[in-house]
Amino acid sequence: MCSIFSISRGRGWALVCLALCFAMGGKAFSQSSPLFPEGAYWYTPLRLSQGERKLTVSGLIDTGCSFCVVDSTFAVDSCRLRGAALTTSYTRAANEDRVKVHTCVLDRVDFCGTTFLDVKCLVVDLKGKFFAYAPNFIVGEKLLSAQPLCFDLRNRRLSVGEREGEPAVVLHWQTRESRDGTFTKGIYLKGRVGNKKVRFFLDSGGRYNKVNLNLLPAEGREQMDLPRGDISQALRVQQVQVCRNVETKVDDWTTRLNFVLTDQSEAVLNFDFLRNTVFVLDYDRREIRIKR
């Protein structure tokens, strides 16, 4: 599950744009949708329908979530979901803690030109954990994997399908399924940090790139106070070690990234390594095709 704590300016602009698009005949989803950066995160507008209620919402793109997620306050107050519509379930937090949540089924979700019916979502107390930084809706893999999606981070557009032109680099990934079924199609990429081999988990809902502290030398580390949290524990400021401008190779793509150092064995990347690129996320082929 993603880590969420950032400034809310991007979501505000997304909602303004979405409201205008629907006022002009609901054509926001005909070909593509705008993307709005917010720190390391990317948001895009969606439309949710539950019964006779139709809601506009800015959704966080999160490759680290198998299911879509609805904030519990938003689910009750805006979607008008009540106890009878919610089923108790369990999921895993980023620290592997088992967390009690609820599930619901939304009648309809319009996302990037495609209508999805009967969308199963997790209902999580995001606002209680991440406070003012919590999104109302998270776009998980169930929607992201339905068709190839082209992310134009230069022009801030999200569209369905392939972009013309040969890819400059094709990144191939592997998947892993959890034993409890809460995590189904996770994206794992081979790479290197410095000169050491790693396997990256791609979590676009994570604020920081993270790597095990034993993979990088002690020289050049900084101490920083950063907000951290997940669905098992509320947001709080922690002192962490950070390494900046680290040479990083993701499959055949080389870049430089900042990393938060952790004691976890799993390395994590957000979309920062793809900044200023145009790429296609294709779950069927298990590829990220970075365009020229």
Predicted regions and their residues:
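Pepsin/retropepsin-fold aspartyl endopeptidases
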Residues: 28-292
